[in-house]
């Protein structure tokens, strides 16, 4: 908990830089008429522009995030409680420091995060930058309001309530109880750093100065 609160504070005060781009490892593609990774493909170009979205191959997810910064990262693959095939395992969160603030994952089993050694929860406990972790695809998530300054908590509620407002080709498991956010619901993608170096003087008048955000 101490580590999470510290990196949350650092993100809000821009003590580390999160490059505005997205990373994708898509091991499913078209899966029985649905495409789980559409949650990344339709949001990341909107957030950052198509030139700031990178797709990596098998084994490239953690090795890339350990060395480069991405504001958002997505990975999907056949799952277990502690892994997503072609993406990584909980051990990768321990041995590496993934530099993605918002993490979106999809695969079997680990969406049930109330177990030990859980792949979805491991991200926010890592020494990397991850502050929010989402299990998406069943149903699809809608986080586009974050591009206009809304919080991830706002988008969590939007997704939880969504049935017909936003539609995908399939939207299996819409409005079910498992839709949840791992992390701080007040996080925003567009952080405004607090003003710094406040000073005041009082003579004939009171004069306040500060360094702007």
Region roles according to the model:
Residues 1-196:
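Cysteine-dependent hydrolase recognition
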Residues 188-213:
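Pro/Thr/Ser/Gly-rich low-complexity, intrinsically disordered linker/stalk tracts
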């Amino acid at each position: 908990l101490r580590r999470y609160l510290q990196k949350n504070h650092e993100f809000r005060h821009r003590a580390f830089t999160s490059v505005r781009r997205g990373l994708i490892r898509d091991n499913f593609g078209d899966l029985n008429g649905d495409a789980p990774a559409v949650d990344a493909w339709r949001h990341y170009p909107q957030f950052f522009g198509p030139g700031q979205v990178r797709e990596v191959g098998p084994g490239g997810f953690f090795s890339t995030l350990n060395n480069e910064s991405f504001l958002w990262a997505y990975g999907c693959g056949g799952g277990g409680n502690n892994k997503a095939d072609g993406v990584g395992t909980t051990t990768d969160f321990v041995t590496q420091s993934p530099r993605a603030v918002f993490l979106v994952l999809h695969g079997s089993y680990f969406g049930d995060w109330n177990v030990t050694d859980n792949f979805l929860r491991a991200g926010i406990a890592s020494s990397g930058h991850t502050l929010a972790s989402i299990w998406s695809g069943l149903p699809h998530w809608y986080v586009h309001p974050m591009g206009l300054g809304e919080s991830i908590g706002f988008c969590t509620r939007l997704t939880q309530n969504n049935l017909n407002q936003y539609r995908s080709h399939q939207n299996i498991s819409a409005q079910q109880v498992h839709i949840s956010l791992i992390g701080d619901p007040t996080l925003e993608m567009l952080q405004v750093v607090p003003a710094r170096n406040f000073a005041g003087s009082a003579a004939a008048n009171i004069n306040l100065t500060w360094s702007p955000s």
